[in-house]
């Protein structure tokens, strides 16, 4: 395996990590901004108000995006196995 192939696998792994994390992080970000906006508009300064909706939203997003994440990871694993077999 040449250096270029190793860099290609590393790049693909980093891209896969971003694809796996992005949906959950975006949902958490959006829920956090909405709750923060709600707190600012209503002048409720409760620090624990943010955690419960974020946890629920992230859990639901994990349930929704889990099939996509599984297919992305299995596709990457097939690609790695094909590269190993091709050596």
Swiss-Prot record:
InterPro entries listed in its UniProt record: Bac_export_3, FliQ
Transmembrane segments: 18-38, 55-75
Protein location: Cell membrane; Bacterial flagellum basal body
Keyword Transcription attributed: no
Keyword terms, alphabetized: Bacterial flagellum, Cell membrane, Membrane, Transmembrane, Transmembrane helix
Record carries keyword Nucleotide-binding: no
Gene Ontology BP annotations: bacterial-type flagellum assembly; protein secretion
Cross-referenced Pfam families: Bac_export_3
Superkingdom in the source lineage: Bacteria
Membrane-topology descriptor: Multi-pass membrane protein
GO cellular component: bacterial-type flagellum basal body; plasma membrane
Major localisation: membrane
PANTHER family: FLAGELLAR BIOSYNTHETIC PROTEIN FLIQ (PTHR34040:SF2)
Role: Role in flagellar biosynthesis.
Family that this chain belongs to: Belongs to the FliQ/MopD/SpaQ family.
The name this protein goes by in its record: Flagellar biosynthetic protein FliQ
Organism, scientific name: Caulobacter vibrioides (strain ATCC 19089 / CIP 103742 / CB 15)
